[in-house]
């Protein structure tokens, strides 16, 4: 730890650690996205054995995305609650909070339908 990190109040340290965890999750999510793209390409090339890995990577991607967005939302709420008390006044734009949940659910349903349709086509072939 740097000297400046040691001098930070405990609340700030906790927030920084939490944001570092969100950052790690987002990096993990990018790795999963890379694996999704690779395995999807393999499935498209006819490598049906890669389909379970594709499904696992997609599931892990969305799970990590859900977890990271939840933690980030919590940090935004904590920031909003503590503005003026522990932190200098700032403007937190709340317009977009919660809108992505509906889109995420819609994408999950689309993916399930895609995989279900693809499974049916594979089993009838």
UniProtKB/Swiss-Prot annotation:
Pfam families: Med11. Its main location: nucleus. Gene3D superfamilies: 1.10.287.3490. It is found in: Nucleus. Transmembrane segments: none annotated. Component of the Mediator complex, a coactivator involved in the regulated transcription of nearly all RNA polymerase II-dependent genes. Mediator functions as a bridge to convey information from gene-specific regulatory proteins to the basal RNA polymerase II transcription machinery. Mediator is recruited to promoters by direct interactions with regulatory proteins and serves as a scaffold for the assembly of a functional pre-initiation complex with RNA polymerase II and the general transcription factors. This is Mediator of RNA polymerase II transcription subunit 11. It comes from Candida glabrata (strain ATCC 2001 / BCRC 20586 / JCM 3761 / NBRC 0622 / NRRL Y-65 / CBS 138) (Yeast). The gene is MED11.
């Amino acid at each position: 730890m740097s000297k400046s990190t040691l001098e930070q109040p405990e609340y700030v340290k906790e927030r920084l650690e939490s944001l570092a965890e969100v950052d790690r999750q987002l990096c993990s999510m990018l790795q999963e996205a890379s694996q999704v793209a690779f395995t999807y390409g393999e499935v498209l090339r006819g490598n049906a054995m890669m389909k379970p890995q594709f499904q696992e990577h997609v599931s892990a991607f969305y799970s990590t995305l859900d977890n990271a967005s939840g933690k980030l939302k919590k940090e935004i709420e904590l920031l909003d609650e503590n503005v003026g008390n522990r932190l200098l006044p700032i403007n937190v734009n709340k317009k977009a909070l919660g809108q992505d949940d509906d889109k995420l659910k819609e994408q999950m349903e689309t993916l399930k339908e895609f995989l279900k349709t693809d499974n049916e086509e594979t089993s009838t072939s």
